[in-house]
């Protein structure tokens, strides 16, 4: 689905000089809020900053573990295939894309922008990932450009993986601030059943506080549809 107004210049950008690339890379690499990587079509990682490695592979991960390798060598194949397909589409069309996923229990939005650097054989794709809490709309995040928006079919729920599909649905609605009665109506269940699910969620996550459960749901950006997505 294409989002945003039409702009013929999107993705055309022109070639970046080496000095511009160096300055851009230095700025992005040091941004503590952004995970950044550079890919070739096919998903070969040319470069990544430490933040991206930690977002997707944990606090002890480093870029050296990914650079020079294909995504299929690093991540579960079914997830890697999804990401590579977005990279390849960006490179082929010259248009950017926004990819949403849940990874290690947190919602991540990744902006992919194709460009053609000087002295390169072809198009490369710059990927910038950020953690986004709650259900912020991509149209509001990126209102001025035309882009394709994708939700990955495969997610990594992290600590939430212990929950059943129904429990994830209940947790997602808790994160939206719904009461037990409202959740019961939305899921066509009794209030008693919803409270039982909520108690089970609390026991599994070792959290007996409704507000804290809602915060966890918001951190993951949980939506009802996420409950039935394929898990890693």
Predicted regions and their residues:
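Short, charged amphipathic alpha-helical "coupling" segments at sensory-output junctions
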Residues: 2-24
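Sensory modules in modular signal-transduction proteins
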Residues: 16-58
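Regulatory hinge/linker segments at domain boundaries
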Residues: 142-169
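Short alpha-helical "packing" element that flanks the helix-turn-helix/winged-helix DNA-binding module
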Residues: 167-174, 213
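Recognition helix of helix-turn-helix DNA-binding domains
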Residues: 177-212, 216
């Amino acid at each position: 689905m294409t989002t945003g107004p039409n702009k013929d210049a999107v993705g055309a950008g022109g070639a970046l000089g080496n000095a511009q690339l160096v300055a851009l890379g230095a700025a992005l690499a040091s941004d503590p809020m952004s995970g950044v990587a550079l890919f070739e079509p096919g998903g070969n990682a040319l470069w990544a900053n430490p933040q991206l490695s930690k977002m997707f592979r944990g606090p002890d991960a480093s870029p050296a573990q990914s650079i020079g390798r294909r995504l299929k060598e690093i991540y579960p194949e079914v997830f890697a295939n999804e990401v590579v397909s977005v990279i390849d589409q960006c490179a082929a069309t010259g248009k950017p894309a926004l990819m949403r996923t849940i990874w290690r229990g947190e919602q991540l939005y990744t902006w992919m922008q194709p460009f053609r650097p000087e002295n390169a054989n072809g198009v490369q794709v710059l990927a910038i990932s950020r953690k986004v809490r709650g259900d912020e709309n991509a149209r509001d995040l990126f209102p001025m450009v035309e882009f394709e928006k994708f939700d990955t079919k495969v997610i990594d729920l992290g600590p939430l993986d212990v929950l059943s599909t129904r429990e994830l649905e209940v947790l997602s609605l808790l994160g939206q601030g719904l009461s037990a009665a409202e959740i019961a109506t939305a899921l066509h269940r009794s209030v008693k059943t919803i409270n039982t699910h909520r108690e089970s969620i609390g026991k599994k996550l070792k959290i007996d506080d409704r507000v804290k459960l809602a915060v966890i749901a918001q951190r993951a950006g949980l939506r009802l549809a996420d409950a039935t997505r394929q898990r890693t």
